[in-house]
Amino acid sequence: MRTRRLPLVLAMLAALPVVAAQESTTGPVAPAISVVHCGHLFDSETGRMLGETSITVAGDRIKAVRPGAPEAGVKVIELGNATCLPGLIDSHVHLTMQTSPTQYSDQFRWNISDYAIRSTVYAQRTLMAGFTTVRNVADMANESIALRNAINAGIVPGPRIFSSGKAIGSTGGHADPTDGYRMDLAGDPNPSGGIINSPDDAWKAVRQHYKDGADLIKIMPSGGVLDESASVDNAQMTIEEIKAVVAAAHDYGFTVAAHAHGAEAIRRAVIGGVDSIEHGTFMNDEDMKLMKEHGTWLVPTIIAGKYVGEMAEKPGYYPAQVAAKAKMVGPIIQGTAGNAYRAGVKIAFGTDAAVYPHGQNAKEFQYMVEAGMPTAFVLQTATTHAAQLLKHEKDFGSVTAGKFADIIAVPGDPLADITLMMKVEFVMKAGVVYKRDSMTVEPLTQSAPTPSKAQGDELKGY
């Protein structure tokens, strides 16, 4: 990666919203008022399936939701007998990268522009899969912040993004991008680059993230699977460092997500006050009890664990040390998620997209059901629960008057067959129709809308 060019490239990417202000966007938008008519509606607030429903959309918001057919004389988006659901939320993605057998060498051949351009493709695949909002938890050089800005400006299609920017962790830990590489090639990251080794460093790192335009903070208090270090589960941050990150983050209104596989790292993160545990592979009964007491969310990412376990069996796909760790995590993570559900831990949907190919996010629903979670509950994890984790339950997470018009549709009853969530045929985000397979929808030809205040810079997409 040509790091000398990085400041210039990032400056260019960050300027995208300014460019957008000088251009006339041409993307499709919903008319001033239209009605989405579907055979069934999943009520994510109650977990019940409702019958025939008409959803009135005014601009980017839902104006009314009523049973039955639409009134005469209104513009109708007719979805027949399809089931409508709220736009889905994936609480753990990495839109600026994707798994590949060359991923470890690519970072020395590609510059940050290569990753940023590819991210626009991954974002569109995610939106087409029905995910209208995502939490992007870690990138390499804040390129997901530039992607968020470009989507908000109407330059490229994609989900509403809440971005952490770079992750924060310790020297030699899972967040250290130089781990396993020569210092003269990779350098020695400091707090401005997300690497900390004291509470004072933590404050500087969080403040830098605020300056960079992040929407939340992601920390790495445990080892991980895909880095080239030896351990997947060792604790890599002290409680004092975690508490400092959380205190600084809360000063800026940020939530804190913690990547943690190991039991001790999970314990420290929960005591330190984080909002969510990502993965939680080796959590024990004490961890689950602590999480329930503290109200800490679990974002399970079962699909990622299964995928790395499968790829680890392919010779050469991962470095040997990575493959060994993947084989440890793969068989365990699904059972842990089921145990956490039965222990009463709060669960929000998240997949670790990029660890597996983008656009396959909905496979996680099937894996959660297989882990013993009720189907309605599983759908709620990607709607009301995830919205609560993001602290934006007033804006999205259910098909309710006043919220963003984020609506998707599948061809049948997902409560009876959860695999239908992998067959999304209709996607509307903030009143704009992006996908309409096999549906009767009038062409929409107006230019892209200016986001309302709750969707714009204050939300920052994440």
Give residue spans per PLM region:
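His/Asp/Glu-enriched, well-ordered alpha-helical/loop segment
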Residues: 107, 251-255, 320-321, 327-413
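Metal-associated gating/positioning segment near the N- to mid-region
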Residues: 82-155, 171-178, 240, 264, ...
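Histidine/acidic-residue-rich catalytic or RNA/ligand-binding cores of hydrolases
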Residues: 99-102, 144, 173-174, 227-229, ...
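Acidic, glycine-enriched loop/beta-strand segments at the rims
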Residues: 24-27, 41-54, 67, 374-379, ...
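Divalent metal-dependent hydrolysis catalytic cores, especially in the metallo-beta-lactamase
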Residues: 118-143, 157-167, 214-227, 255, ...
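Active-site gating loops and adjacent loop-to-helix segments of metal-dependent hydrolytic enzymes
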Residues: 97-115, 124, 171-190, 225-239, ...
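Histidine-rich, glycine-flanked metal-binding segment
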Residues: 27-32, 41, 46-85
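Alpha-helix-loop-beta-strand connector modules within alpha/beta enzyme cores
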Residues: 149-167, 232-258, 295, 299-303
